[in-house]
Amino acid sequence: MKKLGTEKIPPLVGRGVLLDMTKHFNVEYMQLGQPITTDDIKLAAKSQNIKFQKGDVILFYTGWTDKMLKSDPDLWNSGEPGITNDAAKYLSSLNPMAVGADTWGVEVVPAIEGDKLFYGHITLLKENGILILETMNTGELVRENVDEFMFVLGQPKIKGTVQMIINPVALW
């Protein structure tokens, strides 16, 4: 990668918001293949009194990784709850700096009928330059009832890489 490696990405510092989708769906954790739609995002934000702002880091808590990574890693790896293609378009319209989740791909897997698998990556990253943050440890924020925080990430500057393990910080 010579043009778009992660060494070109500046440190990310901004307002983070966390949508607790387990609270929205009234479940301990979302299920494999369970979609997060545009309406779900709007309703969860409204119930948490979150008003999106340009440049936000928008994160989702599904409970999927907290519940399934250790108890059933094969199931955890076979699919996940996540955003739909339409939800990715809606999120892009909010002009966030980044979108992420506590899942390994952010998007629903398998894709819902009519959606293309991982097309949200194209919508967010390729078409809109919105960074994607996967397998984010958002559980502690939920347990502390934190919806809004300062998000700080100084990622490694490794030339030619397109992804990496990161350790962002949420300050509240």
Give the predicted meaning of each segment.
Residues 1-172:
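Active-/binding-site microenvironments in catalytic and ligand-binding cores
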